């Protein structure tokens, strides 16, 4: 339990930041899930649109420190590869 005034304030700040970060992380997961669902459905246009919406969310989470920058880059890269593979015609 925090005893000093500054420690109590720090605890309050941590709780606020935790809520903000939790919401941001949830938002990122939602956008990534939308891309994955579009890929699973096989709709290339929908997948590309969802990917273009998810990309800045991942970058924002990385810049705010919610995700490590390498993690965000890895997620973007893997999603981009899957979207690209979906848009390439399988008969070519």
Swiss-Prot record:
Region (Disordered): 1-24
Keyword rRNA-binding: yes
Keywords: Ribonucleoprotein, Ribosomal protein, RNA-binding, rRNA-binding
GO process terms (BP): translation
GO molecular function: small ribosomal subunit rRNA binding; structural constituent of ribosome
Source superkingdom: Bacteria
Function: Binds directly to 16S ribosomal RNA.
NCBIfam families: S20
Alphabetized HAMAP family for the sequence: Ribosomal_bS20
Name this polypeptide is given: Small ribosomal subunit protein bS20
Originating organism: Rhizobium etli (strain ATCC 51251 / DSM 11541 / JCM 21823 / NBRC 15573 / CFN 42)
